[in-house]
Amino acid sequence: MAADKPHMNLAVIGHIDHGKSTFVGRLMYDAGAVPAHVIEKYKEEAKQKGKESFAFAWVMDSLKEERERGITIDIAHKRFDTDKYYFTVVDCPGHRDFVKNMITGASQADAAVLVVAAPDGVMAQTKEHIFLSRTLGINQLIVAINKMDAVEYSEKRYKEVVEQVSGILKMIGFKPGDIPFVPTSAFYGDNVVNHSEKTPWYKGVTMMEALNNLKVPEKPSTLPLRIPVEDAYTISGIGTVPVGRVETGTMKKGDKVVFMPGGAAGEVKSIEMHHEEIPQALPGDNIGWNVRGIGKADVRRGDVCGHTDNPPKVADTFVGQIVVLQHPSAITAGYTPVFHAHTSQIACQLIELNKKLDPKSGQVKEENPTFLKAGDAAIVTIKPTKPMVIEPVKEIPQLGRFAIRDMGMTIAAGMCMSVKQK
């Protein structure tokens, strides 16, 4: 049963049309997660639309509109098992305007598979996705050099693409030697579960073996307790019940906790998960909990619960390292977009542009730049317009990452380097 196996969240990233959905469809199909009759139905539908090669991808693209356009939009959660783990696939779309989905999707992932099409090699989004997944704290990567059937399973072409991808990985601090590269054809299933006869020159692992070789990230239960509040309910006979996912630390009945930035504190009376009372909550648990003396007015979405002896940090200002993904013009000091961090969404002002960095190496390119534009990486000083909890990424990574949104798009992704507390 899947519950006995460790669970991993897997992001699938890469440039549009490089075969991500087909790849995920194939993984699930070969892992026995998709009934054969469903695949047959998709094949038939795809054939009628003249897109026969899309059959497996249709397992993932269950949204009608996407089928018509032939692309994947929202993040789809799919599940499959290997011998060792059970995986939830966080399928990250490839279109440019979907970088926000990538930010919310990738940050839930423990590992990523980068899909690069052999005929095209590295494209703009291949780079952006590698970079973003690194920014968002994904440290385990597997690279699938896909569509090998389209280059007649050429070892020479495979090596060229491996070389291209390795170059980018090195620039941002991955060690290419530690990362498995697998030549695949998701459509035909080469090297996904079984070694392919068409690549006799390839002696490495199959995709399934590479997935089994991933390491389970350690649960951050030794870090200070942090539970971002998603919502708070009033339940008759119990009182106010905040709900949220434990990001770090552990919480037991009887613990003294505080909700920041408001500062309301009390003793934990009960903890519930899946409608059952539990004695303690661990990282990853989605819980509801009741705290003595806390009323509906004391707690709201975006607050963070922690122990009173190590409360969540409330920033007067904080220093962030950001990557500007897109902006119609330029960003200057004084810019006040909305910051999305854990469950909070708060307008914050960039009060100072401290340094412009080379996005590839992290080296300082310019001190106190006058503006930032798409593609730039920078260190900036940020002032929230109202009290906000954020933690340095080195101390509590789960509460140190943020996305900057404005004009209906993701402007930048970033992480908090230091906090000046209120």
Curated annotation (Swiss-Prot):
Keywords: Cytoplasm, Elongation factor, GTP-binding, Hydrolase, Magnesium, Metal-binding, Nucleotide-binding, Protein biosynthesis. GTP binds at residues 14-21, 91-95, 146-149. Residues 70-74 are annotated as: G2. Residues 185-187 are annotated as: G5. Residues 5-221 form the tr-type G domain. Its EC number is 3.6.5.3. It is found in: Cytoplasm. It catalyses: GTP + H2O = GDP + phosphate + H(+). GTP hydrolase that promotes the GTP-dependent binding of aminoacyl-tRNA to the A-site of ribosomes during protein biosynthesis. This is Elongation factor 1-alpha. The gene is tuf.
